[in-house]
């Protein structure tokens, strides 16, 4: 008897659930894939160090994200990058305000290189033109407008050493070599590496400090 009663209750609840379900006609329209996954109209605005120019990301006529730049008093901007495939996702101003720096990989391989666009000439330079490496900008400082620190696994694919990059010439000099367990570096206001973050065998994190650039 109890079994039949339980079955009856379940049947009633099952039928009631159909009545509580709204029909497809009552549902709001589906959000389009373009809204969910498409490019934004404009995003990631960045003002130059001297405060005279504004840069942002926006799609070009082929819907590829590019960097756009304009003087702050001008209404319309112009495209300064010309990527043909995946578009630009990450960029920043150089401290001298005459160069846009951006990261780009090749066909989604995530081996990002550091590029620079000279705004006066429009020329693009790959500052890390080495096959199979991955690079990133580690630090910049307004007191050193022609220099940045770049991390790159050129010497050993497992280690990301820090290199000092001169933007005007493209010269790269090894600044700080990474130990096996180091995963990140931090620079001070003089653009000197002063701290390293390392991972312990147990999965923890330790911070190593040094007094100056000559210290290990």
Which sequence ranges carry the predicted segments?
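Residue-level detector of Asp-centered blade-edge/turn motifs that repeat once per structural unit
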Residues: 49-50, 95-96, 142-144, 189-190
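Short, solvent-exposed loop/turn segments at conserved positions within beta-propeller repeat blades
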Residues: 60-65, 107-112, 153-160, 199-204
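Bacterial N-terminal signal peptides that target proteins for export
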Residues: 1-9
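Multi-bladed beta-propeller domains
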Residues: 25-41, 70-89, 107, 118-135, ...
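Beta-strand-rich domains and repeat architectures in extracellular enzymes and scaffolds
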Residues: 34-65
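Bacterial N-terminal signal peptides
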Residues: 9-19
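Hydrophobic beta-strand positions that form the internal "hydrophobic ladder"
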Residues: 51-55, 98-101, 147-148, 194
């Amino acid at each position: 008897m109890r079994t039949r009663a339980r079955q009856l209750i379940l049947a009633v609840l099952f039928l009631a659930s159909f009545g509580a379900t709204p029909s497809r006609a009552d549902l709001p329209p589906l959000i389009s894939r373009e809204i969910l996954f498409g490019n934004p109209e404009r995003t990631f605005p960045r003002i130059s160090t001297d405060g005279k120019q504004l840069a942002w990301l926006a799609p070009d006529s082929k819907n590829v994200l590019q960097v756009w730049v304009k003087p702050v008093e001008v209404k319309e901007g112009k495209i300064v990058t010309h990527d043909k495939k995946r578009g630009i996702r990450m960029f920043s101003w150089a401290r001298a305000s005459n160069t846009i720096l951006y990261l780009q990989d090749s066909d989604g391989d995530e081996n990002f290189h550091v590029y620079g666009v000279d705004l006066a000439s429009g020329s693009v330079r790959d500052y890390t033109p080495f096959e199979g490496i991955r690079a990133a900008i580690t630090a910049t400082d307004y007191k050193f407008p022609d220099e940045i620190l770049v991390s790159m696994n050129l010497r050993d694919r497992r280690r990301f050493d820090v290199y000092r990059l001169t933007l005007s010439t493209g010269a790269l000099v090894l600044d700080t070599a990474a130990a096996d367990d180091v995963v990140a570096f931090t620079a001070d206001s003089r653009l000197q590496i002063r701290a390293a973050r390392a991972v312990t065998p147990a999965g923890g994190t330790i911070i190593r400090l040094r007094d100056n650039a000559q210290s290990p």
